[in-house]
Amino acid sequence: MIPIQLTVFFMIIYVLESLTIIVQSSLIVAVLGREWLQVRRLMPVDMILISLGISRFCLQWASMLNNFCSYFNLNYVLCNLTITWEFFNILTFWLNSLLTVFYCIKVSSFTHHIFLWLRWRILRLFPWILLGSLMITCVTIIPSAIGNYIQIQLLTMEHLPRNSTVTDKLENFHQYQFQAHTVALVIPFILFLASTIFLMASLTKQIQHHSTGHCNPSMKARFTALRSLAVLFIVFTSYFLTILITIIGTLFDKRCWLWVWEAFVYAFILMHSTSLMLSSPTLKRILKGKC
């Protein structure tokens, strides 16, 4: 059990982190959305960032409401909020992976004909790929939606005698639900890892190939990109591991350590959100023009 003062302190830290992420997400959507209305077209990276901004905005509000309902034992509200959090969490993972795939396809120097064909196809079909990630998220969330419906039904029958056979079947289903959610996060994370490794290998190869021109702007840009990619890799991997531990939910006493853990998790998410803001040339150009 931790002191109430520490609980309040970490609760405030978590709320401040959440509000910062919400403001960042709103800024990304507002700035890039305005640019879209003006020029009537967006680069694929900006399409992903707008989608990520909307997804993360909804995810953060769902997270805040979900955590407060969990802390104050508002079970009926919690069941509906959990499915919302899971949906936007899985969608955010897919969009982050697509962003890395885009950079890998766009920046990598591999010249294999399959890679070149993939580059041509992916860049042409990017809006459909975004729609596909939304559809995949909708499909993977179905077990969680069924599980939440069952949980709501159980809450309405708390006063009735329990059937042990039915209870066992429901526990087995919840195990399957957990496995489905884990797989839904692991697949885009593996995609992120593969794309990041390919991209880092390509940038390292380019740096070694042009090692004589160490001070030219092109080399500096490659070094900066490689350093940024390494930071993104560490932050996103930490984000994935903390979310996975959160889903497992057996490491900590929820009531006791909830706000400490959430403040820790969302510190990584805040760093990741900030790094994404700095990854858009359009966003940086517009914000510099406003300053």
From Swiss-Prot:
It is found in: Cell membrane. Keywords: Cell membrane, G-protein coupled receptor, Glycoprotein, Membrane, Receptor, Sensory transduction, Taste, Transducer, Transmembrane, Transmembrane helix. This is Taste receptor type 2 member 16. Residues 1, 63-84, 147-182, 250-257 are extracellular. GO terms for cellular component: endoplasmic reticulum; external side of plasma membrane; membrane; plasma membrane; trans-Golgi network. Expressed in a subset of gustducin-positive taste receptor cells of the tongue. Expressed in circumvallate papillae and testis. The keyword Membrane applies. Residues 23-41, 106-125, 204-228, 279-291 are cytoplasmic. Its main location: membrane. Belongs to the G-protein coupled receptor T2R family. It is a multi-pass membrane protein. It comes from the Eukaryota. The gene is TAS2R16. The keyword Transmembrane applies. One of its GO terms (biological process) is detection of chemical stimulus involved in sensory perception of bitter taste. It comes from Homo sapiens. One of its GO terms (molecular function) is bitter taste receptor activity. Gustducin-coupled receptor implicated in the perception of bitter compounds in the oral cavity and the gastrointestinal tract. Signals through PLCB2 and the calcium-regulated cation channel TRPM5. The lineage of its organism: Eukaryota, Metazoa, Chordata, Craniata, Vertebrata. The chain crosses the membrane at residues 2-22, 42-62, 85-105, 126-146, 183-203, 229-249, 258-278. Interacts with RTP3 and RTP4.
